[in-house]
């Protein structure tokens, strides 16, 4: 996966194995147009490139919490050992990788507001209408593709298919076979199996407070996020 779409953050120290060759010089050597993946804050992205196109993929922050919890438990360089309740407190207070989900997305929203070429996608929409999203993506990138190619990519993007691909599954990140793999469930709404009623209410209160002025606030309906929209 990283060979096709290098992770830009691996240019930043410390550079984890087996990505030592993913240096800044390596990224610079890739001819344009190039596709780079990035999980970090916007101020760390390459600047002064006016033709850059940005694709921001968002996911329900409650599912993000559960996914991050399992990801950190299985990652070699971290191997988080505490339970879900402890992790929830860290997540809610922003004491996790990349900091507060709220601040992270508010910074990206502000950063992208001054950019002309931006495509917003949600994980939930990808799960629901993958072919439509792929068509939008191809149009945004100005890539002409046939319906057959869209069908093939849609099939290859299914979690069951990606798990068969060692490069996509990123097994090198795992600590041991007892932990969750890099590609775990990939479902929408798994947070309901983890959040207690009290945790859910606390998160909802903070979400409404922090995201009140954001256009991302209503990206997910009540059935997904579990927060009633205000008309």
Predicted regions and their residues:
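PAPS/PAP-binding and catalytic site of the sulfotransferase fold
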Residues: 121-145, 153, 161, 204
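Active-site/pore-lining binding-face segments in mid-to-C-terminal subdomains
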Residues: 151-164, 171-172
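PAPS-dependent sulfotransferase catalytic domain
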Residues: 1-121, 148, 167-231
